[in-house]
Each structure stands twice: as structure tokens, then as C-alpha cells.
UniProtKB/Swiss-Prot annotation:
Sequence similarity: Belongs to the UPF0250 family.
Cited InterPro entries: UPF0250_YbeD-like, YbeD-like_sf
Any Pfam family the entry gives: DUF493
Entries under PANTHER family matching the protein: UPF0250 PROTEIN YBED
Protein name: UPF0250 protein BP0104
Domain of life: Bacteria
């Protein structure tokens, strides 16, 4: 990761920040990843997760809108989601 000075960041903190996650359809996909998100944003509301199944129903897309408080928080959350075995893509 590159160190970007706060004055050069395109994100102002704190702010609401959407993170999109895709993975294969699994009964516990949304719940499992919500638990990961809660580790980085304890105030996250699980009822706010947006879910979109793929056209064929094999994949599920989730959008988590987290309260971003720092670049470090977002970077750590992205790493945790990207490294999770149920996750295919994080945007």
C-alpha cells in the first residue's frame, strides 16, 4: 500500500463509504461477511446490507456502507474481506 498524506486523500474522514463484495452463493455468506465488517465498524447496521444475486443465481453481491474513520481502517477492512475464503472480489 502507498502512504498517501491525508491532505491528498480523495476521501474525507469520517464518511459513509460503500464496499462491494462478491462471492459464490452460500447460505451463510452475508452473515459471515457482516461479522467481518462489524470487527472494523462496530456501529454498522446489519439490516443495511444490500444483496444482489447474479442472474444465474450462482453468485451473490453484497454492499456494505461502513462509517470510514481512517485510511488505515478501510485498508484493514479491505484486506480482511479480500483474504476471506468465501470472497471472490472486493470493490
Amino acid at each position: 500500500m502507498h502512504n498517501i498524506p491525508p491532505e491528498e486523500s480523495l476521501i474525507e474522514y469520517p464518511s459513509d463509504f460503500p464496499i462491494k463484495v462478491m462471492g459464490k452463493q452460500h447460505p451463510e455468506f452475508a452473515q459471515t461477511l457482516t461479522e467481518v465488517v462489524l470487527q472494523f465498524d462496530p456501529g454498522f447496521d446489519p439490516a443495511s446490507v444490500e444483496m444482489r444475486p447474479s442472474k444465474g443465481g450462482n453468485y451473490l453481491g453484497l454492499t456494505f456502507t461502513v462509517r470510514a474513520t481512517s485510511r488505515e481502517q478501510l485498508d484493514s477492512l479491505y484486506r480482511a474481506l479480500h483474504g476471506h475464503p468465501m470472497v471472490s472480489i472486493v470493490l
